[in-house]
Design a protein with these regions (language model features):
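Conserved mixed alpha/beta catalytic, RNA-binding, or beta-rich assembly cores of soluble enzyme
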Residues: 1-189, 200
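N-terminal basic/disordered segments at the start of proteins
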Residues: 190-207
Length: 207
């Protein structure tokens, strides 16, 4: 993600160094995770807990890759798993484990889809002073994060228009502007266009 490398450079080349970074969904945020791994070894993922009801977090990219491979599929087919993971003691344990990780983290990475669902369980005490990385941050999300005590919001989607537009809209605009047929562009090509146009990511200070 060019946006994160740009921010790292712009904010003194040490903003993400050794930061404790928590991902609500590593599978949805793989690109961000790979970039953050360049600056910090302290990456934690909640995929196993939130997807499969396992009261244990995933530490590091290698463990995430193991989970995202065959292990995740196997867990989805474990007989009787739901009887255990849906029990109140297990759900309480998962909520406690995830909340502790959120509280200890400096940076939270939140997918655009399911944004409010991920954050609704948490209070100002949990999110106060955090940096949030997400995409396509509309005004209602800025107000929501402000009320939660978040210090910094990093919107990885550059703002091309007067109103915030989603990633798919921006990709469509770039394809038309540079005469790129749908399906021919790669992520690297779109990233190069964004970099050459010097479109800065949004850094928002809601408080």
């Amino acid at each position: 993600e060019w946006s994160l490398r740009h921010i790292q450079f712009k904010l003194g080349n040490n903003y993400f160094n050794n930061a404790r970074v928590f991902f609500f969904s590593g599978r949805s945020s793989r690109t961000i995770a790979r970039v953050m791994a360049e600056y910090s070894d302290n990456l934690t993922f909640a995929d196993a807990s939130l997807e499969n009801g396992i009261p244990r977090l995933i530490d590091g990219l290698k463990e995430l890759e193991r989970y995202s491979g065959r292990l995740r599929d196997v867990l989805n087919w474990v007989p009787g798993k739901s009887m255990l993971t849906d029990s109140e003691p297990v759900r309480s344990m998962i909520a406690h484990v995830v909340r502790q990780a959120v509280q200890k983290s400096h940076v939270l990475v939140i997918p655009h889809h399911g944004f409010f669902k991920y954050l609704d369980p948490y209070t100002v005490e949990d999110l106060n002073g955090k940096t949030v990385i997400t995409s396509t941050v509309y005004d209602d999300r800025i107000d929501y994060l402000k009320d939660k005590g978040v210090d910094v919001i990093i919107d990885t989607t550059p703002k091309l228009l007067s109103n915030v537009a989603g990633v798919s809209v921006l990709e469509a605009i770039l394809r038309v502007a540079f005469d790129i047929s749908k399906g021919e562009e790669s992520d690297e090509e779109l990233l190069e266009i964004i970099s050459n146009m010097q479109m800065e990511p949004r850094i928002i200070y809601p408080s």
